[in-house]
């Protein structure tokens, strides 16, 4: 009988301890879990680096290049003789698609606590750095159209035209470990990787739903 009483006492003590523990974490005293959100003031996001290991900087010119064998740099092209070229393509080791990339600059809507350094998974707008007419001066910022194609015609500050850069684990054939992927991240939706697809005979940049499907990129100072 004594052993039963001792067991009952232990069970009751354990129950009361659990109740007290649970009550100590109310809405007024919540459990704070670790976070990886870039809004956490205590988290310093890694810098994005160019192919040579230098930090990517806002306003400076870069070539966005696919380092894989047979692939090439991103460039601006005119499909259909439009007044303003708006197709964002990728050079390839095919005669009609050989060539140099078009320089881009990364810009922000306003000044940032990050200074002029681009950091992973922070908001940037991508803009081709090209000579253009007054008619097309506002047609150089990247966006994604209704066909999920990356085109120009976006606007700095438009929440639908936001891009972000994420580090990958890939290493280039030349040994560079600074390989990234681009994501389209409209504020009202989740991010989607930028991949590639032949559309009407052209190697287009497109958004893709599969998280494992993306084009790897390195950034080369122009």
From Swiss-Prot:
Tubers, leaves. PROSITE patterns: SOYBEAN_KUNITZ (PS00283). SUPFAM superfamilies: STI-like. GO terms for molecular function: cysteine-type endopeptidase inhibitor activity. It is found in: Vacuole. A motif (Vacuolar targeting signal) lies at residues 29-34. It comes from the Eukaryota. InterPro entries: Kunitz_inhibitor_STI-like_sf (IPR011065), Prot_inh_Kunz-lg (IPR002160). SMART domains: STI. Residues 27-42 form a propeptide. Belongs to the protease inhibitor I3 (leguminous Kunitz-type inhibitor) family. Potent inhibitor of cathepsin l (cysteine protease). Does not inhibit trypsin or chymotrypsin (serine proteases). May protect the plant by inhibiting proteases of invading organisms. This is Cysteine protease inhibitor 1.
